[in-house]
């Protein structure tokens, strides 16, 4: 059996790992042993698994592997932010960012090689789209970051306390693989991260938002960026498929469905000078969010070459922030981190092959796939 045919155990959730061992004729408890070695001790070889018999280790080496994405570059910012560039098997690359903040350590994870949602202010979208990432490649970013920080002996003794699916790509357009990876993050045999500390950021793929609230009610962030459809159509093209009225209704449903105590949805709003930062935009935003438990996170735009946008003036950001808070909308201003290593929000680019043609094909497929999802949902109702 070639290396390409081997099962990569890094990307298997607990039920999948148990099924794998059952098909080998082994007991289910072997799954627990191997999961701990992989995710608690960051093992990359079966020979490291000293409580697994030699015969089984040999058998595993013939049919399986533990293989994460390859680290090709690491940068450390003056503020302590760390960025890794990971090479994919096909030659593309993605970027992953770790942001330390006191006792909290947040890992920003990518879900696709590139992105075809093509938000006009985001450098990732400018790079085009190549493919979805596998569950092993997604959880492999957490695994590799954990290896960089050293082995974890017990839960709670690890600098990664939070994970945000806010790296390259639209997570809900790679739903199944992202879901598997998040289940591994949440599992005590994986990384033991509570569901309220795992956040999925979406540009508004409504059918998958509805499904996520039923499958794994993690925290949700919505890339909003505009208070009306006309402007959001320009900034976030997916809005043409899922307009704000439908998106706000989906947010209300999600908030009602999640079971953990913190059911507030984060609304991400990048501040673009003279584009979406005027007083009338603040007034429209308050009206739009009325009745939805939200927190607005204002994000000063992080420039990149040929962006076509500028960061809002500091005073405009402060006035926008004040108006929202004064009118009952909890609002914060995100502190820019890692901009000196191009690790700030909207700056991740990685490396994508055949950018233009792949991106155009994927944009078409987004609308085709979401239409199919809508049709399937209608048939089941």
Swiss-Prot record:
Cofactor note: Binds 1 [4Fe-4S] cluster. The cluster is coordinated with 3 cysteines and an exchangeable S-adenosyl-L-methionine.
Main location: cytoplasm
Main EC class the enzyme belongs to: transferase
InterPro entries in the cross-refs: Aldolase_TIM (IPR013785), Methyltransferase_A (IPR040072), RlmN_N (IPR048641), RNA_MTrfase_RlmN (IPR027492), rRNA_lsu_MTrfase_RlmN/Cfr (IPR004383), rSAM (IPR007197)
Keywords linked to the UniProt accession: 4Fe-4S, Cytoplasm, Disulfide bond, Iron, Iron-sulfur, Metal-binding, Methyltransferase, rRNA processing, S-adenosyl-L-methionine, Transferase, tRNA processing
Binding site for S-adenosyl-L-methionine: 169-170, 201, 223-225, 302
Active site feature: 95 (proton acceptor), 345 (s-methylcysteine intermediate)
Keyword Disulfide bond set for record: yes
Reactions it catalyzes: adenosine(2503) in 23S rRNA + 2 reduced [2Fe-2S]-[ferredoxin] + 2 S-adenosyl-L-methionine = 2-methyladenosine(2503) in 23S rRNA + 5'-deoxyadenosine + L-methionine + 2 oxidized [2Fe-2S]-[ferredoxin] + S-adenosyl-L-homocysteine; adenosine(37) in tRNA + 2 reduced [2Fe-2S]-[ferredoxin] + 2 S-adenosyl-L-methionine = 2-methyladenosine(37) in tRNA + 5'-deoxyadenosine + L-methionine + 2 oxidized [2Fe-2S]-[ferredoxin] + S-adenosyl-L-homocysteine
Subcellular location: Cytoplasm
Cofactor field: [4Fe-4S] cluster
Residues in Radical SAM core domain copies: 101-339
Chain positions recorded as [4Fe-4S] cluster binding sites: 115, 119, 122
UniProt-listed Enzyme Commission number(s): 2.1.1.192
Record keyword Zinc present: no
Residue pairs linked by disulfide bridges in the UniProt entry: 108-345
Coiled coil location: none
Superkingdom in the source lineage: Bacteria
Gene3D superfamilies: 1.10.150.530, Aldolase class I (3.20.20.70)
Other comments on record: Reaction proceeds by a ping-pong mechanism involving intermediate methylation of a conserved cysteine residue.
Role: Specifically methylates position 2 of adenine 2503 in 23S rRNA and position 2 of adenine 37 in tRNAs. m2A2503 modification seems to play a crucial role in the proofreading step occurring at the peptidyl transferase center and thus would serve to optimize ribosomal fidelity.
Family: Belongs to the radical SAM superfamily. RlmN family.
Protein name: Dual-specificity RNA methyltransferase RlmN
Gene designation: rlmN
């Amino acid at each position: 059996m070639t290396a390409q045919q081997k099962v990569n155990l890094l990307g298997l959730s607990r039920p999948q790992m148990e099924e794998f061992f059952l098909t080998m004729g082994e007991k289910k408890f072997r799954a627990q042993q191997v999961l701990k070695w992989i995710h608690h001790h960051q093992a990359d070889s079966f020979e490291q698994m000293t409580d697994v018999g030699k015969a089984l280790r040999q058998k595993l080496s013939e049919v399986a592997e533990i293989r994460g994405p390859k680290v090709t570059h690491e940068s450390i910012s003056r503020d302590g932010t760390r960025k890794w560039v990971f090479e994919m098997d096909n030659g593309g690359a993605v970027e992953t960012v770790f942001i330390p903040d006191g006792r909290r350590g947040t890992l920003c994870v990518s879900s696709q090689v590139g992105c075809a949602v093509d938000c006009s202010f985001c450098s990732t979208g400018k790079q085009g789209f190549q493919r979805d990432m596998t569950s092993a490649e997604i959880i492999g970013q957490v695994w590799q970051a954990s290896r960089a920080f050293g082995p974890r002996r017990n839960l709670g003794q690890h600098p990664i306390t939070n994970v945000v699916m806010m790296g390259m790509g639209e997570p809900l357009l790679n739903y199944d693989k992202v879901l598997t990876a998040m289940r591994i993050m949440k599992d005590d045999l994986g990384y033991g991260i509570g569901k309220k500390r795992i956040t999925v950021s979406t540009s508004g793929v409504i059918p998958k938002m509805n499904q996520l609230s039923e499958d794994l009610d993690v925290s949700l962030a919505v890339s909003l960026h505009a208070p009306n459809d006309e402007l959001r159509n320009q900034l976030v093209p997916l809005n043409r498929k899922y307009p704000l009225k439908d998106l706000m209704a989906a947010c209300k449903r999600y908030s009602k469905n999640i079971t953990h105590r913190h059911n507030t949805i984060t609304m991400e709003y990048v501040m673009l000078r003279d584009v979406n930062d005027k007083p009338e935009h603040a007034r429209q935003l308050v009206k739009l969010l009325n009745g939805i438990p939200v927190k607005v996170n204002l994000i000063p735009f992080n420039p990149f070459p040929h962006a076509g946008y500028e960061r809002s003036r500091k005073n405009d950001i402060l006035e926008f922030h004040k108006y929202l808070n004064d009118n009952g909308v909890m609002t914060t201003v995100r502190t820019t981190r890692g901009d000196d290593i191009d690790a700030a929000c909207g700056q991740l680019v990685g490396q994508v092959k055949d950018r233009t043609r792949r991106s155009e094909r994927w944009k078409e497929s987004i609308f085709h796939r979401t239409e199919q999802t809508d049709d399937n949902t209608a048939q089941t109702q």
